[in-house]
């Protein structure tokens, strides 16, 4: 599913269950190139693993792939970033690992800052790891990233 819009929010009516993956980019700033420098925001979740699986054709095209972890971020029990890198290598994709500190920022802010710093042209993100009630009350990385990303997003739930 391709969405070109200035803003998509957590409360929008997108049905993630019907899409293999969801690609979003800003209507006002369409990318000149895409999927040459991809960042995967790894948090150990099933949603992130699905996003990676759906994005595999794009990952094969990339010149550079970075697996990002946020220390003290919103991780859940699951495979480590190193295990993800090994799985990517098994599929013929070279990837580097980057870990960052939140440094007083939210996980979403830290992820977008890292994507900017690495010059990424696509961010792969598992969408809405937290349940809907927690997401509504406390917010989350997905909502923040969807509202503030300047880089195209590829997401799956």
Describe the function of each predicted region:
Residues 6, 32, 46-49, 74-78, ...:
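Loop/helix-junction capping segments adjacent to catalytic residues or to phosphate/diphosphate-binding pockets
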């Amino acid at each position: 599913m391709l969405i070109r819009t200035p803003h998509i929010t957590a409360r929008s009516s997108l049905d993630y269950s019907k899409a293999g993956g969801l690609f979003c980019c800003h209507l006002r700033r369409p990318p000149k190139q895409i999927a040459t420098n991809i960042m995967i925001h790894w948090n150990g979740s099933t949603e992130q693993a699905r996003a990676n699986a759906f994005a595999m054709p794009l990952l094969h095209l990339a010149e550079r792939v970075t697996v990002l972890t946020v220390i003290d971020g919103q991780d859940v029990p699951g495979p480590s970033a190193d295990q993800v890198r090994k799985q990517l290598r098994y599929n013929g994709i070279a990837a580097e690992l980057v870990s960052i500190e939140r440094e007083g920022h939210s996980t979403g802010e830290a992820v977008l800052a890292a994507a900017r710093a690495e010059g990424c042209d696509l961010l792969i993100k598992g969408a809405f790891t937290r349940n809907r009630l927690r997401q509504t009350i406390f917010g989350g990385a997905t909502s923040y990233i969807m509202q503030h990303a300047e880089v195209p997003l590829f997401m799956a739930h």
